[in-house]
């Protein structure tokens, strides 16, 4: 139960990153999650991917997990620079920004990201 006496939402937001340029998980990537309200962005979580390219905990869950528009920011340029990849300045994809909607507080939203220095792909996973 939440503090308001209502049942806790069962949904959660998870993500993982795969480095398609090197064929491995994207580890050590800083990810920021924002809630979007009109033109305002509210930072609600910051995390790093582990050696499997996943976050150790859901990026969002519990009472904070509610319907709305969200934005995940993946710091891909920093990841590739740390791996010694030569990137142009400015990098073509320094940050990958994904804006998406959560319609149900009871669903699992999994947002995988496949990245390379010059492309990315995403989808709603399971």
UniProtKB/Swiss-Prot annotation:
It is an enzyme of class 3 (hydrolase). The keyword Hydrolase applies. It catalyses: 5-hydroxyisourate + H2O = 5-hydroxy-2-oxo-4-ureido-2,5-dihydro-1H-imidazole-5-carboxylate + H(+). Its EC number is 3.5.2.17. Substrate binds at residues 16, 54, 123. One of its GO terms (biological process) is purine nucleobase metabolic process. Pfam families: Transthyretin. Belongs to the transthyretin family. 5-hydroxyisourate hydrolase subfamily. PANTHER family: 5-HYDROXYISOURATE HYDROLASE (PTHR10395:SF7), URICASE AND TRANSTHYRETIN-RELATED (PTHR10395). Catalyzes the hydrolysis of 5-hydroxyisourate (HIU) to 2-oxo-4-hydroxy-4-carboxy-5-ureidoimidazoline (OHCU). HIU hydrolysis also occurs spontaneously, but more slowly. Homotetramer. This is 5-hydroxyisourate hydrolase. The lineage of its organism: Bacteria, Pseudomonadati, Pseudomonadota, Gammaproteobacteria, Pseudomonadales.
